[in-house]
Amino acid sequence: MAVAVRVIPCLDVDAGRVVKGVNFEGLRDAGDPVELAHRYDNAGADELTFLDVTASSGNRETTFDVVRRTAEEVFIPLCVGGGVRGVAEVDKLLRFGADKAAINTAAVARPDVIDEITRHFGSQVLVLSVDARRTRPGSKPTPSGFEVTTHGGRTGTGIDAIEWAKEAADRGVGEILLNSIDADGTKDGFDLEMIRMVRAAVKVPLIASGGAGEPAHFPPAVAAGADAVLAASIFHWGPNDMMHQVKDAIRNAGFEVR
């Protein structure tokens, strides 16, 4: 792989605090987002991703304030998702200091919004966040066996996850953030089959997310086709040198890291 693999801590932000659960349930407080962002920047993170998991839209302004304060503190790229519905939200995030915006539910509901945002700001600004899971027994099967979910992984759509990733790439998204709902927070490793299938379908950069529990879990995700790897719990509650451990594991497997 010619381009260095990026290692990206993810901060799930709820009402101005970082939280983390298992399969998007049982959220527990992990700290102040600005402090954590500063810590990860100093530790050598290549980027940061903020995902606003706030249930109430009334707390969105809190998130914009967090983005502004974080952007003043850290100097690595910052991607922000959650509640992004169109050009207006992306514009506001960029003005508050974000470098990229991630879109999920709104794009599933109205795919044309991808075209509108990329036409306005360029592909490099837009990340499609795909929360995918294996189809459930009794639910409508999909060709790949994976379906797209919305609303933080709570709502199945019946849309094939691989086909959706391909459509979004064709529409011009700059990157795809592929999160396994089944693996999320379990610390059992990434869903390598899903990564391989999406990699075979798209040429845009692919960020793998969901399931990292130890440094050894990261190299297989890169080998499966991920250009970047994203994790939360392992960084929030792991030792202070976890970023170095993860990068060493990837480097020792023969991949370039920054």
UniProtKB/Swiss-Prot annotation:
InterPro entries: Aldolase_TIM, His_biosynth, HisF, IGPS_HisA/HisF, RibuloseP-bd_barrel. The keyword Lyase applies. One of its GO terms (cellular component) is cytoplasm. Pathway: Amino-acid biosynthesis; L-histidine biosynthesis; L-histidine from 5-phospho-alpha-D-ribose 1-diphosphate: step 5/9. The active site is at residues 12, 131. SUPFAM superfamilies: Ribulose-phoshate binding barrel. It is found in: Cytoplasm. Its main location: cytoplasm. It catalyses: 5-[(5-phospho-1-deoxy-D-ribulos-1-ylimino)methylamino]-1-(5-phospho-beta-D-ribosyl)imidazole-4-carboxamide + L-glutamine = D-erythro-1-(imidazol-4-yl)glycerol 3-phosphate + 5-amino-1-(5-phospho-beta-D-ribosyl)imidazole-4-carboxamide + L-glutamate + H(+). Its EC number is 4.3.2.10. It holds the Pfam family His_biosynth. CDD domains: HisF. GO terms for molecular function: imidazoleglycerol-phosphate synthase activity; lyase activity. Keywords: Amino-acid biosynthesis, Cytoplasm, Histidine biosynthesis, Lyase. GO terms for biological process: L-histidine biosynthetic process. Heterodimer of HisH and HisF. Belongs to the HisA/HisF family. IGPS catalyzes the conversion of PRFAR and glutamine to IGP, AICAR and glutamate. The HisF subunit catalyzes the cyclization activity that produces IGP and AICAR from PRFAR using the ammonia provided by the HisH subunit. This is Imidazole glycerol phosphate synthase subunit HisF. It comes from Pseudarthrobacter chlorophenolicus (strain ATCC 700700 / DSM 12829 / CIP 107037 / JCM 12360 / KCTC 9906 / NCIMB 13794 / A6). The lineage of its organism: Bacteria, Bacillati, Actinomycetota, Actinomycetes, Micrococcales.
